Regions:
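Metal-associated gating/positioning segment near the N- to mid-region
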Residues: 54-131
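Generic detector of well-ordered alpha-helical packing
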Residues: 14, 50, 62-64
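A short local loop/turn or secondary-structure capping micro-motif enriched for an aromatic residue
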Residues: 41-44, 65
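Metal-coordinating catalytic core of metallo-dependent amide/deamination hydrolases
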Residues: 133-143
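N-terminal metal-binding scaffold of metallo-dependent hydrolase/deaminase domains
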Residues: 1-42, 53-55
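C-terminal cap/linker of serine protease catalytic domains
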Residues: 13, 130-133
């Protein structure tokens, strides 16, 4: 599906004083090439009916710790000691890697397409970013 039309969507463009409007979006090789408001979509494309669902630009989260889920901790813990224990075994390192990769994917599935990490578990943020950039993992752009 190289070329397709997202039909019957409601656009939220993120501009100041934005007003939602109905439009079709023409996508070619994964890149949005046109937003069509006159109903005249190219005919050589497959169509995906959005049935009035909203479309908006990806969100940006500028303060992310991929090793955490973002929920408040019930009690204070010694994170340095915990990290040493986790990284002491192969299964612990594997679990930590999968945790970080999963939280990156959760960000993406929540509409966040770019994140800035501000501290994580050793080099797992960087390794996760590299896997995403190579197409080995689904996730947001990590800066």
């Amino acid at each position: 599906m190289n070329k397709y039309i997202l039909k019957n969507g409601i656009i939220l463009d993120g501009s100041e004083n934005m007003k939602p409007y109905k439009a079709d979006i023409f996508v070619n090789n994964g890149i949005i090439e046109d937003i069509i408001t006159n109903g005249k979509s190219p005919s050589e494309c497959s169509e995906i009916d959005l049935d009035g669902k909203y479309i908006m630009p990806g969100l940006i989260n500028m303060h992310v710790h991929l090793a955490g889920n973002g929920k408040p901790q019930k009690k204070q813990r010694d994170n340095e000691k915990l990290v040493k224990k986790v990284f002491a075994t192969p299964i612990g390192r594997f679990a930590a890697t999968k945790l970080v990769e999963n939280y990156a994917k959760i960000e993406l599935m929540s509409g966040v397409t770019t994140i800035r990490t501000v501290g994580g578990l050793r080099d797992l943020d960087t390794k996760t970013r590299d896997k995403i950039n190579k197409g080995l993992l689904d996730g947001p752009r990590i800066i």
